[in-house]
């Protein structure tokens, strides 16, 4: 479809594969991992583009930074096999997600109108997912994929399978909603309600702060230096007040971990509210192990898979979630991104990833005058980053696809002539 000019339809199919068939069709029905299909899609179109266009890979900062990070990933794969002795099958299973960054070269061939249309269709999909998620929360009946894990909390049921696309589209619904009147308000309300239903306190707090920031931003409050200073002072007082208890508990947790006091962690499972002590200890245990390896502390300990013979033979961490076999997950965790970073990437790789990540934020900040979608991208990236201590979303490369969509859209002269429709009808302007 992409090769025959049907780029919008092709993009929707790609996102269908990228985000677990929109959580509507179980993976066992499809027969393959949908993420693998998304990777094959991108890899095929990337190779096709290289053969068709002479200027397919532009000489710009985006290419340089993406290329630098992918070069590190390629080197890490070689290091994993020839230095650590990890099998190629494990390395490919772990490292293949990074090929999704090649989608930058695929999406830059779309014009703004095609991108806007694709996002509008995906927005409708997310609203349908959100409606089904709300039904889950009120009935306790699993509808979307991965709904097996849930708990009753008060009059509601706490499910963890909120759509990964929702983190972007909740801001899109508020600030770039393509619909009018009733449909605009109803879709916005559904999106906002859904973001609170997983009942993650850190996610809820981060969203509220970024929501307020976004409202002030689109109303140009920050254009006045005086108002900006007053606002920042108020936010500082608010954040300081809210975090007083959290800070005290955090220092107690860190002191316990440093003293080797893990007694409170013995019964921590997904069925209970994971404490910050658990997350700090999870990171601390893996960080200190990484520092003991002269190569690993800089370049990571390799691309091994969870539960493999190599992993079981080389790691014996005490802190982690209990797996199906009654053991402890050594590498993967949904509770914190940084534990995975230090194991997989080491210090150098983590720094390179952060350079890539904050490049996106700076890029969209620079072009914020070209459309509110830039503000949406920044808020989305900040949400993922601020929740990195309580989730693994920052490590998921598929979460970077949305920022990659609009990169170069304001730099290519022919594309600058396109009229950006349905992107700036902000409800708070």
Cite the ranges covered by each PLM segment:
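Hydrophobic transmembrane helix bundles of membrane-integrated enzymes that assemble
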Residues: 1-265, 327-418, 422-426
């Amino acid at each position: 479809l992409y090769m025959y000019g049907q780029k919008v339809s092709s993009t929707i199919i790609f996102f269908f594969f990228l985000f677990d068939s929109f959580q509507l069709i179980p993976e066992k029905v499809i027969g393959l991992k949908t993420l693998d299909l998304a990777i094959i899609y991108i890899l095929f179109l990337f190779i096709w583009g290289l053969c068709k266009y002479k200027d397919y890979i532009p000489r710009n900062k985006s290419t340089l930074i993406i290329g630098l990070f992918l070069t590190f990933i390629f080197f890490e794969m070689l290091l994993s096999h020839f230095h650590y002795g990890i099998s190629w099958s494990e390395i490919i299973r772990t490292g293949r997600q990074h090929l999704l960054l090649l989608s930058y070269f695929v999406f830059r061939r779309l014009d703004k109108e095609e991108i806007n249309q694709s996002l509008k269709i995906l927005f409708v999909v997310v609203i349908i997912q959100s409606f089904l998620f709300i039904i889950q929360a009120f009935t306790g009946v699993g509808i979307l994929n991965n709904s097996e894990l849930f708990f009753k909390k008060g009059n509601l049921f706490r499910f963890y399978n909120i759509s990964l696309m929702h983190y972007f589209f909740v801001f899109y619904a508020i600030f770039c909603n393509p619909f009018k009147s009733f449909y605009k308000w109803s879709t916005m309300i559904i999106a906002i309600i859904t973001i609170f239903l997983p009942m993650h306190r850190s996610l809820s707090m981060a969203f509220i702060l970024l929501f307020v920031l976004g409202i002030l931003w689109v109303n140009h409050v920050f254009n006045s230096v005086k108002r900006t200073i007053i606002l920042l002072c108020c936010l500082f007082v608010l954040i300081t007040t809210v975090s007083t208890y959290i800070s005290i508990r955090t220092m107690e947790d860190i002191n316990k971990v440093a003293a080797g006091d893990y007694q409170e962690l013995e019964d921590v499972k997904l069925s209970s509210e994971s404490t910050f002590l658990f997350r700090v200890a999870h990171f601390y245990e893996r960080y200190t192990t990484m520092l003991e390896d002269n190569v690993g502390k800089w370049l990571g300990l390799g691309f091994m898979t969870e539960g493999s013979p190599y992993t079981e033979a080389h790691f014996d961490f005490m802190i982690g979630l209990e797996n199906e076999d009654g053991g402890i997950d050594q590498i993967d965790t949904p509770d914190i991104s940084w534990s995975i970073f230090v194991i997989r990437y080491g210090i150098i790789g983590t720094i390179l990833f952060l350079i890539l990540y904050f490049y996106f934020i700076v890029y969209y900040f620079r072009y914020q005058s070209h459309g509110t979608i830039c503000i949406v991208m920044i808020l989305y990236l900040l949400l993922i980053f601020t929740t990195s201590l309580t989730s693994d979303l920052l490590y998921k490369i598929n979460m970077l696809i949305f920022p990659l969509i609009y990169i170069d859209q304001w730099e290519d002269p022919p594309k600058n002539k396109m009229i950006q429709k349905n992107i700036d009808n902000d409800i708070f302007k």
